[in-house]
């Protein structure tokens, strides 16, 4: 998949019910089973969609989506270089363009990811400003996410990197 020129600028996107999605326009709008008991911190692949978990119930977050022809730098290196707090990545089967939108699919970026060829891809989600303690705590802050998608021939296990300076790191489950 050569780079197709579709790099979403860093934009504000509306989030509802703590979720933003990267999904085909015709995908089912179901939430992951239970975010508060899952070991995923910021992202989960559900079928053809990536569900991004925000700390903001209803409001705006910052997000950017990058479609690449090759894999980016290693996860830990990317986390440190960009000042990100947490990063997760896993495989996704992409068969049609993906749109970045809020849970209801009403607003966002159409065709944020357009694969040259359908098939196995890797998706990496990085977050800043994502407080990970009490899920019911109401905090005023800005969240920022970066989503990177690239093709891959080989399935890989889900991966996670966490900034060791974050005070909540001891309370997080292992990937």
Tell where the protein language model's regions lie, with residue ranges:
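Unusually extended, aromatic-enriched hydrophobic runs near protein termini
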Residues: 94-110, 123, 159-175
